[in-house]
Amino acid sequence: MVVLNPNNWHWVDKNTLPWSKDYLNGKLTSLSTVSSDGKSKIELTQVSSITGDSNVSQRKGKPICYFDLQLSMNVKVTNLDTNKDDEDDDGILADGKLEIPEFMHDESDIPILSQGFDAFDGLVRSEFVPKVVETLLKYQDDLIKEHSKDIQV
């Protein structure tokens, strides 16, 4: 959808939440890493919820974006060490959630809450959460790149 601004109005907005959901689902569900000791694999299996607001606007001829999103993701830790017995039949060592209560356009410090990882919480936080943050920090640039061309002066 192209948003026209024939009289150069002060603000032009475009709702980008549907695109954001597709983008974040695509980028995040492909994330996985093998632990530094090589004994386990951590992977994001599902983005279970994305809510909030995401918009690209034009003000005085310049594209800007603003978003305030809440995300919930399912993550599992699986065993790669064939000598270990703490797993269930599928090799799953832990199955938990990562929650992001506020992912905002003006914050680079993203709070991430974890639950359900028990003994593997430290591993998930130290070796997987940085990959999630790295992916999320690319979102704003990609959002503007994708949608600023749709807002015309």
Curated annotation (Swiss-Prot):
The family assignment reads: Belongs to the AHA1 family.
Lineage, top ranks: Eukaryota, Fungi, Dikarya, Ascomycota, Saccharomycotina
| UniProt cross-references to InterPro entries, sorted A to Z | Aha1 (IPR036338), AHSA1-like_N (IPR015310)
Keywords assigned by UniProt, alphabetized? Chaperone, Cytoplasm, Nucleus
Source superkingdom: Eukaryota
This protein's record includes keyword Cytoplasm: yes
Give the chief site where it resides. Answer: cytoplasm
Record's subcellular location = Cytoplasm; Nucleus
Pfam family, any one: Aha1_N
Gene Ontology biological-process entries: protein folding
Any one annotated GO CC term: nucleus
| UniProt protein name | Hsp90 co-chaperone HCH1
Picking any one GO molecular function of the record gives: protein-folding chaperone binding
Assembly, in brief, is: Monomer. Interacts with HSP82.
Query: What extra comment accompanies this record?
Result: Present with 8528 molecules/cell in log phase SD medium.
